[in-house]
């Protein structure tokens, strides 16, 4: 399932969805909890990225993430956020 498919799903259920987390980091340590055994995996110094996690209310296991990466570590967080939101808007329009 590609990002456009996921965006379409998000749009279709947006009235039933919560935005779980929006991240906008130049450098980050990312923690991923594996659902099967509750192990916590730790990733250090990932590339700059912005992510938005969307999932239906009370159904965290159905969540999915949309990531946009940017290789320029000097970019301002606000600029990254604007870039992300503009890109997200364009992708949503493409789903029509």
Which role fits each region the language model picked out?
Residues 1-47, 60-65, 69-96:
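Negatively charged, low-complexity tracts enriched in Asp/Glu with abundant Ser/Thr
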